[in-house]
Amino acid sequence: MSTITIHTDGACSGNPGPGGWGAILEWNGHRKELKGGEADTTNNRMEMMAAIQALEALRKADRSVILITDSVYLRDGITKWIHGWKKRGWKTADKKPVKNVDLWQRLDELTRSHTIDWRWVKGHAGDPGNERADELAREGLAEARGRQP
């Protein structure tokens, strides 16, 4: 089974405001680029949407995935915090509702289908995959901004 490498990024103009997400999937010499955006969102939601859309694009289950993000929120949320949230009925340690619970639940479901190595990379530091994912996210943001009333 070959490993699929995914680079993701999100962008937002204002927080909240229009936002975009970008993802690159690479496997066996192939490459697929994805992007999208929303007219009213947050940076964290766009970081999460990039990962969700990339994982949803995988056609088969049981994939070995390396997912590279510059979002500590995304990486720590899915690898550390989510276990406690689920035990507490999607509440934080101080008993408040988890923000972005709709996306965390989607991501949780998607992670069950694959073996995922979640990795963090410093944003805007020259990593080619992160830089391209950022470009895609900004394109998604521009498209979302164009759809605003």
UniProtKB/Swiss-Prot annotation:
InterPro entries in the record: RNase_H, RNaseH-like_sf, RNaseH_domain, RNaseH_sf, RNaseHI
Residue stretches spanning the membrane: none
Classification via Gene3D superfamilies: Ribonuclease H-like superfamily/Ribonuclease H
Keyword Nuclease: yes
Domain of life: Bacteria
Locations listed in the record: Cytoplasm
GO biological processes: DNA replication, removal of RNA primer
Binding residue positions for Mg(2+) 2: D9, D134
The protein, known as: Ribonuclease H
Source species: Maricaulis maris (strain MCS10) (Caulobacter maris)
High-level lineage: Bacteria, Pseudomonadati, Pseudomonadota, Alphaproteobacteria, Maricaulales
Gene that this polypeptide is encoded by: rnhA
